[in-house]
A protein has these predicted regions:
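Conserved active-site segment immediately N-terminal to the catalytic lysine
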Residues: 18-52, 67, 88-93
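Hydrophobic "anchor" residues on beta-strands that sit immediately upstream
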Residues: 14-15
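Acidic, low-complexity intrinsically disordered segments
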Residues: 31, 61-62
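Short glycine-enriched loop/turn motifs at secondary-structure junctions
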Residues: 49-53, 149-152
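Short, glycine/charged-enriched secondary-structure capping and boundary segments
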Residues: 5-9, 30-33, 55-56
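Short beta-strand-to-turn element immediately C-terminal to the catalytic PLP-Schiff-base lysine
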Residues: 42-43, 56-61, 110
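PLP-dependent aminotransferase class I/II
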Residues: 2-11, 27, 63-172
Length: 172
């Protein structure tokens, strides 16, 4: 659906932000999630495929958006100025916040990037095993892919064929 959404956004001159918080490494039609919109957002919270314990990232291939994001995340100041050494350039260009990731948190995330494909493969293998094990229960509907997408199984969510079965399982 992201391509349809992008067409609507473009035809109406709208800025498109893709919520990719739980999809790092997933793909649709051979294209990585997070690469279609003007900007995309990924989460690195504790239960994500790649975790830093907290925080996340915004990605874009638009230089103007990139520069704006840098201002917002750094108190509205340019990040190439040494503010404590040069009082002449201590201007706040606009409203901003302290949304910079700490170096130790970033290092934790960077250390996992080389393992990302392996982590995703492990999740996919685990999901396949669980789905196969649950296949003998027709009332349990396991996750599936439409063939054009690669699921990373951020979560493994089942559906049940009826409310009554759901209630019984819930009360078990």
């Amino acid at each position: 659906k992201i391509n349809e959404i992008k067409e609507v956004a473009q035809s109406n001159n709208l800025f498109l932000i893709e919520d990719s918080a739980e999809a790092l490494g997933a793909s649709v039609n051979g294209k990585k999630v997070g690469s279609t919109a003007d900007s995309s957002i990924f989460s690195f919270c504790g239960n994500k495929v790649l975790t830093t314990g907290e925080g996340g990232a915004i990605v874009t291939n638009d230089k103007a958006i990139f520069e704006k994001i840098k201002l917002i995340r750094s108190h509205g100041r340019m990040d190439n100025v040494r503010y404590f050494e040069n009082t002449e350039q201590s201007k706040y260009l606009e409203l901003g916040y302290n949304w910079r990731m700490s170096s130790i948190t970033a290092a934790l995330g960077i250390s996992q990037i080389s393992k990302l494909d392996k982590i995703i493969k492990m999740r996919q293998d685990n999901a396949e095993y669980i789905s196969k094990s649950l296949s003998k229960f027709p009332e349990i509907i396991t996750p599936s892919s439409d063939g054009d997408s690669e699921h990373i199984y951020q979560m493994y969510t089942i559906r049940l064929s009826s409310k009554e079965i759901r209630d019984k399982l819930h009360n078990f």
